Structures are given as structure tokens and as C-alpha cells.
């Protein structure tokens, strides 16, 4: 209904001002209609090919029906009208499931005006079919609207329910127009002002039209610097918080107003919030946008669409059928609708049911229901309860207090694939691979319908077109049919893909390329379940951006609360019907002046109310219009902005309260379609002109300043503070005395993200640490001198990013010149700094480009330059001449035509190949690229080239990195290399196969031989006949010989395979030589040849090296010499070839000389080849494998040495080899302990070592169950204990006190030194007396031998034991006849004290001794005869029976000759001969004391109840250790693994076991784990710590450290000795007794 036209005419005619105003409004409305028509014409492109009359130009539509185009359909801004009229509209399917069905048949009356859905449809039809109005018709329309506005529609107007067909038609028409168009959106955005209205409209638009489930608006804290200040959350909406507009209204108390946000209720009941004080981005629930995305939006300055894949942890719970029927319209709902209307026949009812089900399914697919808390939440639920205050609190806390819990990946979306247009789902994302997408039972038949069958109505919207046209086949949280969504409610995806859209709100501009120069004032972000997001929806949003920007900018000028004096919000219900309506009013701060009904409250005024005056009109904000340049065709503004400008002009003419108006004026402003009438009632005398009124919110002090500034007055302090805080420079003041900051402006605080107190406390700590020292020094100097300050620094931003600033400061002085304060500024010059660096870099590149180009052209190689973006950017003339390509065809990727097709992948830069060729140079950190590529030459052949390039500017953007490289022709070298590689591979295969075969053969043959030799040794201990004993010895000798050959083969295979590893241990060179010669002495003396050796005086006595391997070399070489020598002698000499004291190394040289038959030069070439021997017809066939010398040479080379030989046939052979060793810095000058070798101070072994024992050695990997094999293993791999011994020896050398826990009762050492009494005595005194034995200075010794090298060897040994300075001389004779004649015919005048004779037979000895004893000069001479055992027996009998000989002066030395054998003979003649008896007494006394200690220990152990727990899995070891424990009287218990040991220990009392002996390698639980369990149990139960000793055959240092870390108290290496066990047990017993005495 509209009021009569004459009513408005009378009112207007009474005032001339209003007539002018009406004319101006008519003029503006005429312009507006044209602008709207031009604007809506541009909307047709955004909806694709679908034609809808509502999207046509209003101008073209209105030409058909001019009289019907008016603004009488615009409703007032009441919440109820917005629910029914304003965009977005509620789906009628949702209205049908309301709790009160009778609401469908009535409409509520509003205080201002009302609206009926039927009239809305009529007005819509009239709009679509009415011509455009003229200027006069617009005026009439204005009058008619005013008349209509004055009419009160307070009665309920029910729908026409004459027939069910009409009702169904009405519902169908209402459903068709539930979605508006872009035109409606734009008009609604600019129609209402205020942030609450803005946010309500945004929620309505994006939640229902753009399928948004979550929306947020962020804005910068400082608009003057949006890049360097953090952004904050202003508005937020979560689709999970729903509000039912038909339920009871929300009752909010006053406490809600004191919160930090305001709740806004949208048309569909959804709630959004607006922060009064904008919050941090972390407050956002699902974090739609963060600081990194903000920076990306600022850089791109355009709308961005991302795809986010979220990982959800959702329990797969079965939804009950009742839940399903409660979430969608059930049969009862449909029956209630049928009973209410009573006119629907069965066919219509089924059709309605189908539409409702499809609507529910589509709503679920489109993401209208929230999926954050549960899978499906429906608006059709019938048992919904109204919200309470606690619900609001929970929703607020859950939405804004929790941290984002979902893990997601985010990337920018691509364009839609062609499958998105298909009527069926895309096969690329089918969940069921067996389903054929082209032959399905349920297709969307509507997609194939003709135009005659289905026609689109005139009210279809942009979003509806998008869903039908572009969203087919999209991922709506799973690509399934509608039946699947309705029937399967229990399938919850673990990964959900959503679309995130970021819309920057920027000042609109007609030129799209100028967006880089604009900055957004806010960023609107929303989330949608449409993946990918439709393009036409994006186009619609882009057209709405200017209106969203204008609305948001205008809303910033309006206070968030409706009234400036408002303290809190009240949600009241003011309605004249039964329908509840939410209205927001503001309560005044003054309780004495409450708002009356009809007064203007906030930005909403009830113009029809009585008593309205100018005082009730709020201050109108200034608006930011969209410039006319945005519209390219029509350069005009739109209606909405013109309306607000008119209101602003009108308000500027209203005086405060002075003038009176006699006549009420009523006017109406209408803008757009379907808008409410807004009427303002004024009094005539209150309309005056007041141009001094400003739109900005200024204080009275500001007005005073504006008025007084012209008179020269200074601006007030508040204005100065505002100015300082607004300038884009950091301002600070500092104390001139201390230099500390006293104040900073707001710009500084925003940049650093701190408050004033924090900034004052931190001072200059935000400066980069590298710049801070220089800054403080210059700052102190400036403070001291009172001069200006200038420094360039890097200042830390709120997000920990450093930016360059120029800091300037000047002193502020008073009239006397004293410095009161320092005033400083910091100017951001980061961009200038980066630009300066880039300019310098480009200048340097440009300066060197010509030089590089000249050098490249002069190079004979191919030179090129490339980058990742453009490919090849330069190639020199050499490439052009080689390939025949032109420069233009080679640039970019054109060079690939000359690259072999298989090598083209190699041309990718390193970053493209994920680091395949990306080699980082460690020296300078540059990236290099190298590849071998085949290029085609001009003759068509491909040649190999080595391509090398280097990255000269390694930047973060890899596409701009410059690579310079060269190509070198390596074709000939490549061909040769391939041939050599093929030959080498084949040779290695053959050698590897042979070595593998030999290794397998040796292992398979040697294993049974070990059993044969072991059993034969046991057999020899039994009673056998002479013939059986002979057979057994032959078997033993043959088995040992065969085992020697097999071991040699294995050693050779290990050396060739690189598996031979040397050990470093202390050993004596002299002792090693003695051992090797003594081992082979029996073989040499049985053949009647002499065997001797010498070690020079300057050879270090102790060196570090692999003793066993060097002994093996000596045995092989000396044994080979003995084998090929039948007459004469074999002599070995050791000397120093080179010594280096700086590195503490020495190179020793060995020479082995024999008097055999020798060999020629041809045989010398075959000497060091495997399985080769010297063959000659004159030589007999000798046994052997032919591997001894080969293995010896390999071992010598492992010691950094060499081996060679020289020979002359018929004369003899000389073998030479060298090896490098480390010298022992600290000589052993202390006496060795009992039971240890006096040479190397290592414990003795159990039995005397022989050559055969060594060759029984294994490779160190097998662990047999017998002591014999275990001993062989240790001998084969002596490195197991060498490192430990070396460490212990080093420690004892430093402390000069040695305690050897490994001392044993055996009589043999690894170093080869014998344990006979004379040897021990020699080495003991030799260590204490390294200078030698002192004799009479007139003494003279004579050596007579029948061979050349034997006399030299005996003389050398005498020199090693006698002090040369106290001895006159040693005379040597190598010829017995010459010596006999000279000694008898020409006797020596000096005193001859010793004559050493080494003669070939017994007769020579008898002749020499008897003849010399008859001479008076040799009366007191001592004769030393070097003989064999048989010769000694015969000579002893002859001299004892002879009366002419003095047998007491005759002494015997058995071969092999050693210094230790001569030592007792010379020592008894020295001045210290009395010490021998004392030494023997000390030895006997020590033995007696040791025996007494053993008895005492046995008695104490039996008395104390000492008990031992043994954990060992080897039966032989258990027997040995048990025997030891029984001998010393210790109680013990045996367990077979670690688990049994732990359980046995826990079973007894804490102190029951005094010691635990635990093996490291055991089944079930090893020693390490068992020890850890025991130590852990002791700590948990506060048990005393029990001693645990580890037992292992591996004594390497890392094993000892591992035992210590695991909790072991000590470590024992196998084999375990009785003495060692006694020492450990006695130490524990003594400690226990002392503890008891102490307590």
C-alpha cells in the first residue's frame, strides 16, 4: 500500500528548500538508473551461457513497462524483512521444516513497514517486465513510496490457500528466487553502513551464494605501513555456529558487552563476531590466513585461490537410523505438511518429497553443513534447543581459543579440467575403479534435457549457474552419487580438500595493470568445500570487490556500537505478532534519559515514530566511493553513494538546536531494487546551513587549533603526538647522560611488536648483533661529544626479520647550550639497500661481460652460458663451427637438436634433477655441474664431451642463476677408457673367482684336518706299539704339512682381497729374531749347516708393529734358504736403514744370506709369482706350495716396505726386505713382574710355541670349543689383545709401576723369548744395565769359527752384552787352521780371558783345547765351546776322562747361539757376580711367599662364605673356570645365559653373591643387557652394588669402554688364569673386610 500522492505534494510544497532537494534527487535518480543499466549489462559475462532475465540491464527491461519501475519494493532494515527479502534468501525447503508450519501462511507486521512474499514476487515480475521510468515518473514513484511508507500494515495477511496447486506454485516460485544476483549484492553492500551491517551482508552473501563455510577479515594495524606491521583479525565467521531464527531469541546479559567482540546474527541464523579490539591471527580457529599468505597477497595484489588438504582424525562411528531421519525431512514431516495444506494429491506430494531429499543431499554436497565437529549437521533437526549463555561461551571458547589442530598442505589451484563439464564424475578421482563413469545407472538426466523439457526461470542466480555448469564432477568431500550420500552416513574421509579464497580489498581502478601500485586495506578470506572453486563464482566475486571495498571503508567511519554513549548491547523483541524478531538497541550511558519508542537508535532510525527530532539523527560517516573510472562505458557514480551524499549535505544544513521548523517534512530516498524506505522527519526551523561542520571526528581542542593556527599559535600536545605517531619514521628520545631510550613513537612499537615498557626495557637489543657493537661505540662517542649521530643498522621486526635503517640523532639544547635530550629518527632504507646492492651487482656483471665474452671467443673449447629460465643464452664461435648451428637456433633449448637423445636428460640443471649432479664445493660453497654428453658434429657423428659449469650467482631464485661452462672433447679418451674398463672388469672377475675358489677349498680341507691333528695328538698320549706310534707320527706330520699349505693359500687370498689387517703392538726385534731362528734351528742343524743371526747395536730394542706377521716373513725367508742349502751356513742380519726422530719412525732392513746353489736371472723373475718354484735338472725336487715368498712380499708391502733378491748360481742367494715401525719413546727400565716375559712384559702362554702351532691358525672368525683351537685363534689374530696390552703398558710406563693381571704359570711368550732361568736373568740385568757387563780392561776375547758369518754373529752377540769401554778387544777368526797356527806359534801378549770355539767336528775341538791348555799363556783362559747336544755329550766324556785337560775351564754353549747363553759365563767374571746368589734367594723367597698367600686366601675365602655367580655358555670355559674356583675354595653357581643369571641373582638375598663373572656373548640375553638389568634393579630397590666382571675373548679398546658404560666393574680377557682370578677375588675380599672393620 502506498500513501496518497497529494499528501506528499502538500508537504513538499510548504518549503522551498525541500522543493530544491526534490529536484536534485530527481536528477540524481535519473542518472542512477542509467548507471545501473550499464552496470548490469556487464554482469551477463559472469554467468556463462545461461540467460536469465533478472541479469539483464534494468534499463532495457524497464523500457517495456515504464510505469512499473519504482523503488516501492525496498524494505526497511528490520531483521524480519531481511530474512524474507534481503539477499541472501532462505531456501524454502528449510522453511517447510520449521517448528511452526503456520508461519508459512502469514507475515509479520513491522514498526516501519512490512513485506509479504507474494508482493515480493509480484514486484519482481513487475520489475522484470516494466519499462524504465522517466525523470517525472521517478518523482511520482518517490511520492508514491512516501505514501506507501506512511501506511501501517499491522494485520497479518495470510496466503491464498484456495487450492493446493496455487500453494505449490507459490512455494516453487519462492524456491526459484532464493538466490539473488550480483546487482542485488552490490546494492545491498552500499545501502547500509556500519561494520555490523557489512559483516551481516558478507555472511549472507558468501555463506549461501558462494558456498563458504568459514569467513574472516584481517586488516593491518597500521595502514601507513602494511608491510612491516602485523595484521590482525577483525571479523570472523565459522559455519559451525548456527542460529535458528524461528526458535526463542537469545537473551544476552550486560556482561557480553564487556567482552572483546560483538556477535552479529545473519539472515539464516548463523552467527559471526566482530572484534572490538582486533585480535591476532592466531585467534582464528582453522587459520584461514597467516602472515606468510598475507605477504603473498600483498605482493600479488589479486584474488588468490588455494587448495588445502586437511588431515582429520575422525572415528568411524555408525550413525543410527534415527539420526538419519532426524536430520532430513521424514515421513511425519511430509504427513504434517499434507494435513496442513490438505490439498496436495499424491503426485505432488511425491514430487515435493523428492525435491526435499535432493535439496538435503545437495546441501550436504555443497558444504552448507559444518563438518568440523561431526560429519553431518542438518537444519531439519526437530529437537533443537534455543541457545543459552553457556552455549555462547562454549562456542566462543571453542572457536577462538583453540589452536589449529588439523595438519594440512596448501597449494594454489589450477584451472578446471575438461571433465568438469561432463555430466558424470571425473574418472581421475573415482573412488571405485570398477565403476564405469560413462555407463552408470544414475546419471543426471537434467543435463541432457532439451530446452523444451526444462527451462530456467528468470530468477536464477550466478551461483546457481556456477553449480550447474562448472561444479559437475568436482570434489564435494568425495565424488559419489546422491544415493550414496543419503544411504552411507558412516564414511568419514581422513583427508579433506577445501578451497581457500583470499580477496584483497583495494581501491578500484579501471586499469588492471595498475594494481601493483595499490595496497589493500583488508583481506577477506573464506573457505569452501568446492574443489576446485568455480571460475564464474570467482568472476562474480571480482566484480563485487569494489563494492565490498567501499562498504568496508565506509563502515570504518561508523562506530561499532550504534550510539556513541552506548555501554552494552541489548537484544530485545519488538513485534506485534507471534513471530519473534531480533532488534538491537543501545542503552544510553545516562540512565535518566532512556530511549523512547520510535526514537532513532544508532544508525537505524524509525522515521514513522512520533517525537522524532534532529537530535535523534546520528552523525553520518564520510563514505569512500568507488571512482567513476571503474566503469569504462558510463563514467557516472551509482545511486547508493549519491543517496549518502545527499544525506550528508542535508545534515550539514541542520543546525544544532537554535532554529525551529513549523512544518514537518517527510521525504524518502530510494536506491536499487528491493530496498527498504528510509524516511527522516525534520522540522522546518531546524534546517539551517552550517558549513563549518566537519565529517571527521575531531575534538574541541582540534577545532581550537584549527581556528587558532592562523594566528600563529603552536599546535597543542595531543595533535603533536598524533602527528609524530603518524609519520612513517621511527622517532625516539634518549637521555644525554646514559644514552638510554626514554620514549619512542607508536610506529616503533608497531614495528617491533612491543609495548612502551618492553621497548624501554630492551633498549637497543633489537639491533642486529653484528651491528650492535659499532653502533654502541658511535653512540657513546656522540653522547660524549654532544654532536650529531649517524649510523646504518639492521633492526629486528616483530616477525624476527631484520631490515636496514638509517639512525640519526641530534642533541636538543637549551639557551645556554646544554644538552637536554637527544632526538633521533630511524628511517627504513631496506628497499633502497637491496636496490643498491642489486645495482652494484648488475654493474659488476656488465663491467665484466665484455671481458668474459672476449675470453670465451678466444678459447679453443666450447664455452656457453645458461640459466634455468631461458636455457642457453650464449655460445661462442667454437660451438657454432662444431655443430653447424646458428646462434639463434642454439639459444634457449635449440641446442638439444645436436645432443644425443639418450643424453638430453643430462642437460638439466642441478636443481631440476633434485641434486643428481648438484655437487657442492666445500671450499667456497659454489654449485658445480659436470656431465659427459655426446654432441653431433657437422659430419653427423656424435663425439663425447666433458661438460663442466659453475653457478656464478647462487641466489634463492634458481631460475635466475647464471651458469658458465665449457665443453671439452674427450671422445678418444672415452673410447680407450671403455676398453680398459671392460678388460679390468673381466680380469677382476677371474681373479675374484679364483680367490673365492681357493678360499673355499682351503677352508673345507682345513676344517677336517684340525680334527685329525687333534685326535692324533690325543692318540699319541695313549699306550701304543712301536709300529702304531710310527704310523701315528706319519699321520700327524702329513696333516700338519697339508694344513700349512692350506693356511698359506688362505693368507694369500686374504691379502689379495684386502682383508688382511695389521695390528700394532710392542715387541723386541732381537727376541723375534731369536724365536724365528730357534724355531728353524732343528731343521738346519739336522742338515749340518750353520744358522746364525745378528742384530746391530743401533737397532731399537722395542718397536711397535705386527710382530706375528714379521715373524711369518722371517720364517718363510729363512726356512726357504735352509731348504735350498745343503752345505755351509744361513745367516740373517738386521740393521737400521733409515731413522726419523721427528716422526719417531724407523725403517729396519733384513738380509738373509745362504751358501746354496743359487739361481739365474730368469729364475729370479718367477720368484715372487704364486705357485712357482725354481726348477733345475741339477737340483732335487723340494716340497712346498710356492706361496711363502709371495705372501712374505705382500706382508712386507703392508708394512710400507719392499722385498728383493740377488743370486749367483753356485755361490749363494741374498734376500733383502724392509719394513717401517714406530719406536718406543720410553725404554723399559723397571723389572718385569713375575710370570711375565722380560722382553715385552706380556704374560707367558701355556705351552711352548712351534712352527706347526702357528700354521694351525684360523682366520680369527671361528670359535671352537677346545682350548687348543682357541689358542690357535688367538695366535692367528694377535690384534685381539695387542691394543689393550699397548694401552696398559703405556699407562704403566708413565707411572713406572706395573701390575699385570694376566700373569700366568706358563713358560712361553708371544715375542719368542724363552722362560729359562738364564734368559730371564739376562733380560732383567740387561734392562737395568743397558751399557753392558764391565770386565777387566786388559781382557781379550778370541772367537774361532769354521764359517765366515758365524764368527761375525758370535762377536756381535758378545758386543751386545759386554761394555766395550771396559774391554780391550774381540779377535775373530773365520779359518780354523789360520787361527790354530797364530794362537800357538805367535801367542798374544795381552791377557786372553775367553776363547770361543765353533768347530766342525769333535776331533777339532779336542785338538784345539788340549793344545792351547798346554800353553802357559792360556792357563787361566776360559774355553767356551759352541756345540750341538750330541757333541756336548761326547766332548764332556772325553775331557773328563783326559788327565791332560782342565775340564773346569771348559764350558759349553748349545746351538743356536744367543746372547742370553753367553751372558751367565761373562757375568760370573764381573764385579757384580755376587748378585746372582742374592737373585736366586729372592726368587725362592718370592715363591714361598706366593704359596703362603695362596693358602691364606683359600682359608679366608672358606671362612667368609665368598660366593660367585658364573654366567657362561661355553662348556669348556665352564670346566676351566670351575676348576680354578674349586682350587681356591670358592662356592659358585653356573648359569647358561644372561636371563638365568639375572633371575638367579634376584632370587637370592642382596648380599648373597660376592662376585658375578659374566660372559659378554650369550644366548637369550647377552652380558650387556644382563648387567644393565641388574644395575637398574639395584637402583630401584636400593640394593648394594655387587661387583660384576666381564669375560670376553675380544680385548679391543672399544669393547673395554662398552663394558664400562654398561656398568661392569672390571674386564677379564680369555683365557682366564688362576692367578688373575685370585687377584680379583682377593681384592674384593680385602675391600669387604676393610668395610666391615670401618663400620
UniProtKB/Swiss-Prot annotation:
It catalyses: ATP + protein L-histidine = ADP + protein N-phospho-L-histidine. PANTHER family: OSMOSENSING HISTIDINE PROTEIN KINASE SLN1 (PTHR43047:SF72), TWO-COMPONENT HISTIDINE PROTEIN KINASE (PTHR43047). This is Peroxide stress-activated histidine kinase mak1. The modification 4-aspartylphosphate is found at residue 1559. The modification Phosphohistidine is found at residue 1003. InterPro entries: CheY-like_superfamily (IPR011006), HATPase_C_sf (IPR036890), His_kinase_dom (IPR005467), HisK_dim/P_dom (IPR003661), HisK_dim/P_sf (IPR036097), PAC (IPR001610), PAS (IPR000014), PAS-assoc_C (IPR000700). The lineage of its organism: Eukaryota, Fungi, Dikarya, Ascomycota, Taphrinomycotina. It comes from Schizosaccharomyces pombe (strain 972 / ATCC 24843). Involved in the control of the SAPK-dependent transcriptional response to peroxide stress. Also has a role in G2/M regulation.
Amino acid at each position: 500500500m502506498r500513501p496518497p500522492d497529494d499528501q506528499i505534494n502538500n508537504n513538499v510544497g510548504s518549503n522551498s528548500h525541500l522543493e530544491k532537494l526534490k529536484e536534485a534527487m530527481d536528477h540524481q535518480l535519473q542518472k542512477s538508473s542509467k548507471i545501473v543499466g550499464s552496470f548490469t549489462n556487464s554482469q551477463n559475462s559472469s554467468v556463462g551461457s545461461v540467460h536469465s532475465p533478472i541479469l539483464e540491464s534494468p534499463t532495457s527491461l524497464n523500457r517495456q513497462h515504464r510505469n512499473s519501475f519504482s523503488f516501492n519494493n525496498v524494505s526497511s532494515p528490520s531483521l524480519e524483512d531481511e530474512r524474507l527479502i534481503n539477499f541472501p534468501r532462505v531456501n524454502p525447503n528449510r522453511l517447510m521444516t520449521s517448528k511452526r508450519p503456520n508461519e508459512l501462511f502469514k507475515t509479520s507486521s513491522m514498526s516501519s513497514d512490512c513485506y509479504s512474499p507474494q508482493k515480493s514476487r509480484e514486484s519482481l515480475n513487475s520489475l522484470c517486465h516494466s519499462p524504465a521510468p522517466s525523470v517525472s515518473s521517478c518523482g511520482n514513484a518517490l511520492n508514491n513510496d512516501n505514501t506507501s511508507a506512511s501506511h501501517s500494515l499491522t494485520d497479518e495477511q495470510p496466503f491464498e490457500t484456495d487450492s493446493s496447486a496455487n500453494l505449490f506454485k507459490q512455494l516453487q516460485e519462492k524456491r526459484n528466487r532464493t538466490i539473488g544476483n550480483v546487482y542485488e549484492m552490490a546494492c545491498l553492500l552500499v545501502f547500509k553502513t556500519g561494520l555490523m551491517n557489512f559483516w551481516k551482508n558478507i555472511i549472507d552473501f558468501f555463506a549461501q551464494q558462494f558456498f563458504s563455510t568459514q569467513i574472516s577479515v584481517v586488516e593491518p594495524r597500521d595502514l601507513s605501513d602494511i608491510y612491516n606491521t602485523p595484521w590482525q583479525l577483525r571479523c570472523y565467521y565459522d559455519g559451525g555456529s548456527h542460529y535458528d531464527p524461528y526458535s526463542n531469541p537469545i537473551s544476552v546479559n550486560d556482561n557480553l558487552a564487556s567482552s572483546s567482540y560483538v556477535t552479529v546474527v545473519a539472515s539464516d541464523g548463523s552467527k559471526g563476531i566482530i572484534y572490538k579490539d582486533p585480535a591476532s591471527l592466531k585467534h582464528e580457529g582453522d587459520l584461514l590466513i597467516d602472515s606468510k599468505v598475507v605477504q603473498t597477497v600483498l605482493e600479488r595484489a589479486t584474488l588468490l585461490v588455494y587448495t588445502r588438504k586437511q588431515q582429520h582424525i575422525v572415528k568411524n562411528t555408525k550413525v543410527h537410523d534415527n539420526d538419519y531421519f532426524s536430520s532430513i525431512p521424514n515421513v511425519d514431516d511430509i504427513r504434517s505438511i499434507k494435513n496442513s495444506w490438505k490439498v496436495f494429491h499424491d503426485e505432488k506430494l511425491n514430487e515435493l518429497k523428492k525435491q526435499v531429499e535432493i535439496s538435503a543431499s545437495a546441501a550436504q554436497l555443497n558444504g552448507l553443513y559444518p563438518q568440523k565437529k561431526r560429519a553431518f549437521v542438518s537444519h531439519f533437526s526437530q529437537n533443537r534447543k534455543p541457545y543459552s549463555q553457556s552455549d555462547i561461551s562454549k562456542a566462543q571458547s571453542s572457536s577462538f581459543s583453540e589452536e589449529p589442530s588439523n595438519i594440512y598442505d596448501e597449494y594454489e589451484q589450477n584451472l578446471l579440467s575438461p571433465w568438469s563439464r561432463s555430466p558424470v564424475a571425473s574418472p581421475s578421482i573415482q573412488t571405485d575403479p570398477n565403476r564405469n563413469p560413462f555407463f552408470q545407472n544414475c546419471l543426471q538426466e537434467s543435463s541432457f534435457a532439451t530446452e523444451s523439457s526444462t527451462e530456467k526461470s528468470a530468477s536464477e542466480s550466478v551461483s546457481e549457474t556456477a553449480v550447474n555448469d562448472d561444479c559437475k564432477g568436482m570434489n564435494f568431500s568425495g565424488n559419489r552419487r546422491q544415493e550414496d550420500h543419503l544411504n552411507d552416513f558412516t564414511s568419514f574421509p581422513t583427508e579433506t580438500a577445501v578451497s581457500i579464497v583470499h580477496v584483497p580489498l583495494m581501491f578500484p581502478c579501471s586499469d588492471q595493470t595498475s594494481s601493483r601500485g595499490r595496497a589493500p586495506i583488508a583481506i577477506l578470506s573464506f573457505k569452501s568445500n568446492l574443489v576446485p572453486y568455480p571460475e564464474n563464482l570467482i568472476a562474480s566475486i571480482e566484480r563485487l570487490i569494489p563494492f565490498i571495498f567501499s562498504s568496508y571503508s565506509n563502515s570504518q567511519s561508523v562506530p561499532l556500537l550504534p550510539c556513541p554513549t552506548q555501554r552494552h548491547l541489548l537484544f530485545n523483541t519488538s513485534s506485534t505478532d507471534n513471530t519473534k524478531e531480533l532488534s538491537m538497541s543501545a542503552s544510553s550511558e545516562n540512565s535518566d534519559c532512556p530511549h523512547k519508542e520510535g526514537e532513532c537508535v544508532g544508525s537505524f532510525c524509525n522515521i514513522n515514530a512520533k517525537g522524532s527530532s534532529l537530535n535523534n539523527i546520528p552523525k553520518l560517516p564520510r563514505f569512500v566511493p568507488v571512482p567513476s573510472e571503474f566503469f569504462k562505458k558510463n563514467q557516472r557514480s551509482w545511486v547508493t553513494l549519491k543517496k549518502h551524499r545527499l544525506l550528508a549535505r542535508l545534515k550539514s544544513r541542520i543546525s544544532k538546536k537554535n532554529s525551529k521548523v513549523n512544518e514537518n517534512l517527510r521525504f524518502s530516498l530510494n536506491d536499487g531494487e528491493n530496498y527498504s524506505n528510509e524516511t527522516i522527519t525534520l522540522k522546518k526551523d531546524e534546517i539551517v546551513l552550517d558549513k563549518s561542520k566537519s565529517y571527521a571526528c575531531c575534538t574541541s581542542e582540534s577545532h581550537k587549533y584549527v581556528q587558532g593556527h592562523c594566528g600563529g599559535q603552536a599546535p597543542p600536545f595531543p595533535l603533536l603526538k598524533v602527528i609524530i605517531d603518524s609519520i612513517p619514521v621511527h622517532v625516539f628520545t634518549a637521555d644525554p647522560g646514559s644514552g638510554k631510550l626514554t620514549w619512542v613513537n607508536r610506529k616503533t612499537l608497531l614495528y617491533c611488536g612491543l609495548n612502551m615498557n618492553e621497548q624501554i626495557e630492551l633498549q637497543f637489543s633489537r639491533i642486529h648483533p653484528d651491528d650492535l657493537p659499532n653502533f654502541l661505540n658511535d653512540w657513546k662517542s656522540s653522547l660524549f661529544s654532544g654532536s650529531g649521530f649517524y649510523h646504518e643498522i639492521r633492526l629486528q621486526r616483530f616477525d624476527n626479520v631484520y631490515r636496514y635503517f638509517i639512525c640519526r640523532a641530534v642533541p636538543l639544547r637549551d639557551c645556554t647550550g646544554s644538552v637536554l635530550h637527544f632526538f633521533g629518527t630511524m628511517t627504513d632504507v631496506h628497499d633502497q639497500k637491496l636496490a643498491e646492492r642489486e645495482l652494484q651487482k648488475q654493474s659488476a656483471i656488465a663491467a665484466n661481460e665484455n671481458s668474459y665474452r672476449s675470453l670465451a671467443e678466444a678459447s679453443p673449447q666450447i664455452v656457453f652460458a645458461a640459466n634455468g629460465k631461458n636455457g642457453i643464452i650464449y655460445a661462442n664461435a667454437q660451438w657454432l663451427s662444431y655443430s653447424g648451428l646458428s646462434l639463434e637456433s642454439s639459444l634457449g633449448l635449440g641446442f638439444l637438436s645436436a645432443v644425443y637423445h639418450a643424453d638430453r636428460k643430462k642437460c638439466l640443471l642441478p636443481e631440476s634433477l633434485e641434486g643428481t649432479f648438484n655437487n657442492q664445493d666445500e671450499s667456497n660453497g659454489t654449485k658445480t655441474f659436470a656431465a659427459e654428453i655426446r654432441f653431433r658434429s657437422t659430419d653427423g657423428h656424435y663425439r663425447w664431451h666433458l661438460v663442466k659449469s659453475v653457478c656464478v650467482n647462487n641466489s634463492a631464485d634458481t631460475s635466475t642463476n647464471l651458469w658458465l661452462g665449457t665443453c671439452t672433447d674427450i671422445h678418444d679418451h672415452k673410447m680407450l677408457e671403455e676398453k680398459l674398463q671392460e678388460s679390468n672388469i673381466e680380469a677382476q672377475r677371474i681373479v675374484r673367482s679364483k680367490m673365492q675358489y681357493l678360499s673355499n677349498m682351503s677352508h673345507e680341507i682345513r676344517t677336517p684336518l684340525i680334527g685329525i691333528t687333534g685326535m692324533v695328538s690325543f692318540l699319541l698320549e695313549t699306550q701304543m706299539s712301536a709300529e702304531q706310534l710310527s704310523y701315528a707320527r706319519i699321520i700327524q706330520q702329513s696333516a700338519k704339512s697339508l694344513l700349512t699349505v692350506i693356511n698359506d693359500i688362505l693368507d694369500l687370498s686374504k691379502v689379495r682381497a684386502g682383508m688382511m689387517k695389521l695390528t700394532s703392538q710392542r715387541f723386541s726385534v732381537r727376541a723375534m729374531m731369536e724365536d724365528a731362528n730357534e724355531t728353524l734351528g732343528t731343521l738346519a742343524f739336522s742338515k749340518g749347516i750353520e744358522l746364525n743371526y745378528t742384530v746391530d747395536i743401533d737397532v731399537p730394542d722395542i718397536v711397535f708393529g705386527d710382530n706375528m706377521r714379521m715373524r711369518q716373513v722371517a720364517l718363510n725367508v729363512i726356512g726357504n734358504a735352509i731348504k735350498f742349502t745343503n752345505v755351509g751356513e744361513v745367516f740373517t742380519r738386521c740393521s737400521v736403514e733409515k731413522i726419523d726422530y721427528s716422526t719417531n719412525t724407523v725403517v729396519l732392513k733384513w738380509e738373509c744370506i745362504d751358501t746354496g746353489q743359487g739361481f739365474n736371472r730368469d729364475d729370479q723373475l718367477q720368484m715372487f709369482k704364486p705357485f712357482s718354484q725354481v726348477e733345475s735338472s741339477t737340483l732335487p725336487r723340494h716340497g712346498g706350495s710356492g706361496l711363502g715368498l709371495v705372501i712374505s712380499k705382500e706382508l712386507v708391502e703392508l708394512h710400507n716396505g719392499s722385498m728383493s733378491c740377488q743370486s749367483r748360481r753356485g755361490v749363494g742367494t741374498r734376500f733383502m726386505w724392509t719394513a717401517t715401525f714406530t719406536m718406543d719413546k720410553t725404554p723399559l727400565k723397571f723389572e718385569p713382574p713375575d710370570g711375565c716375559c722380560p722382553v715385552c712384559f706380556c704374560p707367558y702362554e701355556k705351552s711352548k710355541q712351534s712352527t706347526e702351532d702357528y700354521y694351525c691358525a684360523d682366520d680369527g672368525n671361528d670359535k671352537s670349543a677346545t682350548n687348543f683351537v682357541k689358542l690357535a685363534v688367538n695366535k692367528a689374530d694377535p690384534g685381539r689383545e695387542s691394543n689393550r696390552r699397548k694401552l696398559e703398558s703405556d699407562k704403566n710406563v708413565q707411572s713406572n709401576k706395573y701390575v699385570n693381571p694376566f700373569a700366568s704359570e706358563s713358560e712361553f711368550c708371544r715375542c719368542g723369548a724363552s722362560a729359562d732361568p738364564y734368559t730371564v736373568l739376562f733380560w732383567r740385568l740387561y734392562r737395568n744395565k743397558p751399557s753392558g757387563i764391565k770386565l777387566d780392561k786388559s781382557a781379550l776375547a778370541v772367537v774361532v769359527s769354521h764359517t765366515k758369518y758365524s764368527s761375525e754373529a758370535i762377536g756381535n752377540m758378545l758386543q751386545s752384552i759386554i761394555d766395550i769401554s771396559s774391554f780391550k778387544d774381540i779377535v775373530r777368526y773365520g779359518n780354523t787352521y789360520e787361527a790354530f797356527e797364530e794362537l800357538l806359534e805367535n801367542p798374544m801378549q795381552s791377557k786372553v780371558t775367553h776363547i770361543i770355539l765353533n768347530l766342525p767336528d769333535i776331533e777339532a775341538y779336542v785338538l784345539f783345547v788340549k793344545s792351547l791348555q798346554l800353553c802357559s799363556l792360556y792357563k787361566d783362559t776360559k774355553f767356551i765351546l759352541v756345540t750341538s747336544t750330541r757333541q756336548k755329550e761326547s766332548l764332556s766324556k772325553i775331557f773328563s776322562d783326559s788327565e791332560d785337560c782342565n775340564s773346569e775351564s771348559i764350558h759349553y754353549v748349545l746351538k743356536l747361539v744367543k746372547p742370553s747363553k753367553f751372558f751367565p759365563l761373562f757375568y760370573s767374571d764381573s764385579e757384580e757376580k755376587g748378585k746372582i746368589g742374592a737373585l736366586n734367594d729372592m726368587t725362592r723367597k718370592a715363591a714361598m711367599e706366593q704359596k703362603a698367600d695362596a693358602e691364606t686366601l683359600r682359608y679366608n675365602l672358606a671362612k667368609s662364605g665368598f660366593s660367585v655367580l658364573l654366567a657362561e655358555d661355553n662348556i669348556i670355559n665352564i670346566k676351566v673356570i670351575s676348576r680354578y674356583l674349586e682350587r681356591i675354595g670358592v662356592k659358585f653357581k653356573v648359569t647358561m645365559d644372561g636371563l638365568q643369571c639375572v633371575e638367579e641373582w634376584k632370587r637370592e638375598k642382596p648380599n648373597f653373591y660376592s662376585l658375578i663373572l659374566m660372559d659378554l656373548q650369550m644366548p637369550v640375553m647377552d652380558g650387556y643387557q644382563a648387567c644393565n638389568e641388574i644395575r637398574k634393579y639395584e637402583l630401584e630397590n636400593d640394593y648394594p652394588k655387587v661387583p660384576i666382571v666381564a669375560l670376553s675373548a675380544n680385548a679391543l679398546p672399544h669393547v673395554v669402554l662398552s663394558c664400562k658404560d654398561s656398568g661392569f666393574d672390571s674386564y677379564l680377557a680369555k683365557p682366564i688364569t688362576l692367578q688373575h682370578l685370585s687377584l680379583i677375588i682377593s681384592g674384593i675380599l680385602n675391600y669387604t673386610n676393610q668395610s666391615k672393620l670401618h663400620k
